[in-house]
Amino acid sequence: MERAVKENHKPSNVKVFHPMTEGPKRIPVSQPPSTQVRPPVTGVSAQRILGPSNVPQRVMMQAQKPVLSNQKPTAQGLLRPATHGHQTSKPQGPNENRNPQQTSHSSTPNMEKKGSTDQGKTLAVPKEEGKKKQWCLEDFEIGRPLGKGKFGNVYLARERESKFILALKVLFKSQLEKAGVEHQLRREVEIQSHLRHPNILRLYGYFHDACRVYLILDYAPGGELFRELQKCTRFDDQRSALYIKQLAEALLYCHSKKVIHRDIKPENLLLGSNGELKIADFGWSVHAPSSRRTTLCGTLDYLPPEMIEGRMHDEKVDLWSLGVLCYEFLVGKPPFETDTHQETYRRISKVEFQYPPYVSEEAKDLVSKLLKHNPNHRLPLKGVLEHPWIVKNSQQPKKKDEPLAGAQ
């Protein structure tokens, strides 16, 4: 099975920003080796909720169904059984078969007016405590499709009153229920809707009808970071350091809110209009006040030793993923990628990888301090932000129209 190019804001079949190019391959993995990984409790395949899956795919690991620790999601009503309307597995546009009895919700009841630096508009949302905006499909003008996925589609949209440009994700309840990933959607909505950071894609709210769930998201016109990596093959030190700095700042914020992402990879990162990085997919994230979990999830190439060995894990899994991502930025492929998933597991367990000669010594130092078998020995996020390689190379572009430093 090939690697996923999950696209929140650019379709695989509609060339929006630049032509799609084929990226590095990934070895298909239906489940982890029984001799090395604690087998999942359920037989539910781990499907991606957001973004297309009709393109080369990096295979997700089969996983248990995580439950929010000490947290009851407010989005429990998202996937109530449909009482009317025709459900179909064939993707439709959001304007087709409109249901007059739409149920609308806002997952952000205390939001102030949000100004978009990307579009220069403001999305009017409730400011008063307890007041909820009752969204419905008629509130939006639907534009061109941005992406097509296994569970639905993504559309460019504009809120009628404010003219705010956004992305509207349309997910089909029948397909979500068939795949058994309702819990994943609820968790994603619950977590992402409460996060406010310039390097995290904003989820403004959601609404649903008998057949579909609609997610109201920021529009990131720069598209998916993975496609940019495919286009450039690899990034230089300046561009890599800038992205790692922005991601470290976003993860530091998430961890302060007791949120573990657990699936950091290029496919889950988008670029804003100024080239800034944005975390866009929280499908595998978890709010874990207990800080210790055993669920196996994420992508094979990015799994840390403690997860493939079935040990308890905490927010330090994101430090490992940050190290893998930094290596992939600089080299163009993950450090533990091999011809077989068994060998990949072995190399991860042994932390066995090599650097090409063109990787700088300072970059090697940062990666090596993140890719530690013992989670407690990994460089913390504050240490990442203070690392000499990051400080030296992560200068922000001065002008909006200027390319990122080191862009190839």
From Swiss-Prot:
The active site is at D263. GO terms for cellular component: centrosome; chromosome passenger complex; cytoplasm; kinetochore; nucleus; spindle microtubule; spindle midzone; spindle pole. The keyword NADP does not apply. ATP binds at K150, K169, L217, D218, Y219, A220, D281. One of its GO terms (biological process) is mitotic spindle organization. Residues 1-10 have a biased composition (Basic and acidic residues). This is Aurora kinase A-B. It comes from Xenopus laevis (African clawed frog). The gene is aurka-b.
